[in-house]
Amino acid sequence: MAGTMDRLEDCNSPETSGTAGDALPSPRVYARRWVFLLVVSLLSCSNAMLWLSFAPVADTIAQHFFLSMDQVNWLSLIYFVLSIPFGMAAIWVLDSVGLRGATILGAWLNFSGSVLRAVPCLPVRIPSPFAFFMSGQSLCALAQTLVVSSPAKLAALWFPEHQRATANMISTMSNPLGLLIANVLSPALVKKADDIPMMLGIYIGPAALACLLATVCLWESVPPTPPSTGAANSTSESFLRGLKLLIQNKAYVLLAVCFGGGIGVFSSFSALLEQILCASGYSNEFSGLCGALFIVFGILGALLLGLYVDRTKHFTEATKIGLCLTSMTSVAFALVSQLQGQTLALAAICSLFGLFGFSVAPVVMELAVECSFPVGEGASAGLIFVLGQAEGMLIMLLLTALTVRRTGPSFSTCQQGEDPLDWTVSLLLLAGLCTLFTCVLVIFFNTPYRRLEAESGGSSSPTMCARDPRTVSPTQVPPLETPGLTPPDEALKEAPGPASVSKGHSEWAETMPRDV
């Protein structure tokens, strides 16, 4: 079994590329990269389930535990609050301690938080259930800072160039998959207040499994040899130096601020969907269905778009088109969600909102790495996440603050005794912010693909497994001056011996953080 997992795949396959003439060993891939991807994906899915588990049944939770809706909303908001200060620490952990150590730490935090949330449901009297809910959610929020920054780094360190976007898509879309499960599972499980303990207990299961697999199955942060030329240099900058380079990179800052705002819009939409729709007369089950459609079509779109950009490398074009379509859909949702009886229209709009919006998330993470190379993937993806959470917290607070109580006839299905909220102004603001971020990104964002250019320039053999001629620098080089091609009479002089290959292997290992 171990021999199969450690088997190097043949260089003639599309999964390996490299030359014997480089100082570093020839790029190779390992089958056990899929195990790492499975663990990270399961952990991300479980963490998202825990984040959104209260939101689809917010009114029932508030009624059973004598909480206000503001308190229930804070169980989601705490993810935003803690991600801002601890997100930077998570970036340091990923780039300094290593991917394996960060994943194991995140798994244990996630599992501990899931258990702590269930304490108020024990058969003994708990004086302050909200304190346990908040403590458990806080631990899960700390785990999220480590989880969401991992996909880009995992893809870069373990996967070859033509699989990076797909690997990033799988691990990134595991998070909305968790949101989907929570949107469907929570309303299905909680028909009455007595069902809440069962719901909280079920959510412990995936967290426990992810913790077990992370502890037992992850052996190292990086493979023995890099899967691509760019992987060997991906963490060449120190943590503080990398952050400085990111802040000075205008294209990256623009991408981070605009897409961070998009993350905030989508996070607020997911957390508040049930409250928005119940005020217009829609049931919790229908709200869960809309949330499920939102995520299912998002995952489908991400799969198709990930495969497309893996082949074409059209990161910028795919991002801009996807965000434009997302903005138009957000306007439609703001208008239709305030009407009664529009179940088919709302279901279609939520499906399109997810299809266009969620699908660009893994593409943007790859684009962030491309425009910020050689800064570490943990820093480039993590900083976008931190900004997204900060903007998401501000947007969510602003949306809830702008709501007012309806005084006229009501079709509300919300279970609280107070008059339902009017979300009209809040939803128009949400659509306006989504459109603003999109316009700024479409008009002003442009960047070269630095990592692809570095890998193209570093190829020293015509047999390198290049995926597409459009991925190289547009500058044409005469055939006799192609970088890396050695005249036949000098080939033997420059071919490295075993010592030089061993030295290159050592240099790759020394640039990577140690396992913990």
Swiss-Prot record:
GO CC annotations, alphabetized: membrane
A GO MF term: transmembrane transporter activity
Native species: Mus musculus
Subcellular location: Membrane
Name of the protein this chain belongs to: Solute carrier family 49 member A3
Keyword Lipid biosynthesis: no
Family recorded in the similarity comment: Belongs to the major facilitator superfamily.
CDD domains in alphabetical order: MFS_MFSD7
PANTHER family: MAJOR FACILITATOR SUPERFAMILY PROTEIN-RELATED, SOLUTE CARRIER FAMILY 49 MEMBER A3
Skewed-composition ranges (Basic and acidic residues): 1-10, 504-516
Main location class: membrane
InterPro entries documented for this protein: FLVCR1-2_SLC49-like, MFS, MFS_dom, MFS_trans_sf
Annotated membrane topology: Multi-pass membrane protein
UniProt superkingdom: Eukaryota
Chain segments carrying region Disordered: 1-22, 453-516
Keywords per UniProt: Membrane, Transmembrane, Transmembrane helix, Transport
Transmembrane spans: 34-54, 74-94, 104-124, 139-159, 170-190, 199-219, 253-273, 289-309, 321-341, 344-364, 382-402, 425-445
